A protein has these predicted regions:
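ABC ATPase NBD Q-loop/coupling interface
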Residues: 49, 61-76, 136
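Conserved catalytic motifs of ABC-family nucleotide-binding domains
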Residues: 54-55, 88-97
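Conserved ABC ATPase "signature" region
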Residues: 64-68, 111-133
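The feature captures the beta-strand-to-loop junction immediately N-terminal to the Walker
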Residues: 33-35
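ABC ATPase NBD coupling module
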Residues: 56, 68-82, 105
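Short coil-to-beta microelement around the adenine-binding A-loop and adjacent beta1/P-loop entry
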Residues: 14-15, 75
Length: 142
């Protein structure tokens, strides 16, 4: 289980994350999605202790299976927490196909179930209405 309590993070005087609290059960696949510039990458970097390498600060508590991540070797931590950064998408496919890769990786093969999970995730992130008509378009053209 990943547990985050009152996570704040920033660089210099600019605070980027403002008190995030979140619990992710062991084995649950979780996507962090949102508009450009909202702090997704910074949030993910806190989970792998990359913020400190870039001169950032953070406060709050992040524990992985009950252990504070500050006490875990970075290499071990980075093997346990998977991340995909918002660099240009590696696969020149549709948005829908790119979103389906993680589901297929975790054993979801049924096309209807994949479509439902993609829709559900986009709705939770409040992005569905924005991208629903673009799901079949190339992700490289966004």
């Amino acid at each position: 289980m990943l547990n985050i309590e009152n996570l704040k993070c920033g660089f210099g005087k600019h605070e980027i994350l403002h008190g995030i609290s979140l619990t992710i059960p062991k084995g649950q696949i979780t996507a962090i999605v949102g508009q450009s510039g909202c702090g997704k990458t910074t949030f993910l970097k806190t989970l792998n202790r990359m913020v400190e390498e870039e001169g950032g600060y953070l406060s709050g508590t992040i524990t992985l299976e009950g252990t504070d991540i500050k006490s875990l070797p970075k290499e071990k931590l980075r093997r346990r927490v998977g991340m995909v950064f918002q660099q240009p998408i590696a696969f020149p496919h549709s948005i829908e196909k790119n979103l389906s890769y993680v589901l297929k990786y975790h054993g979801v093969r049924n096309k209807k179930e994949i479509a439902e999970k993609i829709t559900e995730s986009l709705q939770k992130a409040k992005l569905y209405d924005e991208v629903k008509d673009q799901l079949k378009k190339s992700a490289l053209k966004l």
